[in-house]
Swiss-Prot record:
Keywords, alphabetical: Hydrolase, Metal-binding, Zinc
Protein species of origin: Vibrio vulnificus (strain YJ016)
Protein name: Cytidine deaminase
Domain of life: Bacteria
Any one of the GO BP annotations: cytidine deamination
Gene: cdd
Catalytic residues (UniProt): E104
């Protein structure tokens, strides 16, 4: 990761690389920029807000894991708190393409798992595909969400997705990233399973009712959570494992570091993530133990 950042710094404008390097090369950099950090960079570089976000995209793309396409995409979302969160596309060797995570989904789920309850804007390298436009339409802030592309005027999501189909068309009032706690608890004393339940309580699954969460523990002892993000169009839904894997990559860890995994889901769900979770983790490392609980 450090070498990717160094390459991006070498290609960035000098005023940006000089002031950004101490931030992103720090051991505790977590793929996000606080409002204070971003405002300081604006002053130090003399760039506009839009220009700086676009200039930061190569640093978001540095997190890309794309062994199949070798097409590295970065995205940056700004939460309602003002914090900026990086994201990048993620692919898996030996797993069907439906498990792929797009850069927009990565950045959005990053902000979501860090506690944001909505987004004001998203900045991306390339025009968002239909899959991602639909994914963003599930957000609590979809009506106001702005999209910034390089060398283009900022537009709202619904300029890219007119006459959209969304949760309201299915009679659903809840939205992805809205504050929620589903109230699940378990008597299981396994610490990793307890964390998976924590993620489950934040999940969004109004269509299948498969409220679910994943927790991954790595060799470092750190735990990464993923909550299920369901979508009105079904296919753009983001499984809890992928959300957890995104958090892991954006923390600078590697899939090879995963020691154990836990999945918990509602017994009332019309689907199950168990088989896909097991098969995807097996493709990463067949020795990863997976604990499972249905509540």
């Amino acid at each position: 990761m450090k070498s990717r950042f160094e390459n991006a710094l070498a290609s960035a404008p000098e005023s940006l690389s000089r002031h950004l390097a101490p931030i992103i090369l720090a051991a505790d950099f977590d793929a996000s920029l606080s409002t204070v950090q971003f405002d300081e960079l604006l002053k130090q570089t003399g760039m506009t807000d839009n220009q700086l976000r676009v200039a930061l995209l190569p640093f978001a793309a540095a997190y890309s894991y794309a062994p199949i396409s070798e097409f590295y995409v970065g995205a940056i979302v700004r939460g309602l708190s003002g914090t900026l969160y990086f994201g990048a596309n993620m692919e898996f060797d030996g797993v069907q393409l439906g498990q792929t995570v797009h850069a927009e989904q990565s950045a959005i789920s990053h902000a979501w798992m860090k506690g944001e309850q909505g987004l004001s804007d998203i900045t991306i390298n390339f025009s968002p595909c239909g899959h991602c436009r639909q994914f963003m339409n599930e957000l609590s802030s979809a009506k106001e969400l702005k999209i910034q592309l390089p060398e283009r005027e900022e537009k709202k999501l619904h300029d890219y997705l007119p006459d959209s189909f969304g949760p309201s068309d299915l009679g659903i009032e809840s939205a992805l990233m809205s504050q929620v706690h589903h109230g699940f608890a378990t008597e299981d004393d396994d610490a990793l399973m307890q964390r998976a339940v924590e993620a489950m309580n934040r999940s969004h699954a109004p269509y299948t009712h498969n409220l679910s969460g994943v927790a991954l523990q790595t060799e470092s002892g750190r735990v990464y959570l993923g909550a299920y993000a369901e979508n009105a169009a079904f296919n753009p839904s983001l499984p809890p494992l992928q959300v957890a894997l995104i958090q892991l990559l954006l923390a600078g860890e590697r899939f090879e570091n995963i020691q154990s995994a836990a999945l918990v889901e509602s017994h009332k769900g019309k689907i199950s993530h168990l088989a896909c979770t097991q098969s995807t983790l097996e493709a990463l490392n067949p020795d990863i133990p997976v604990s499972y609980l249905s509540l």
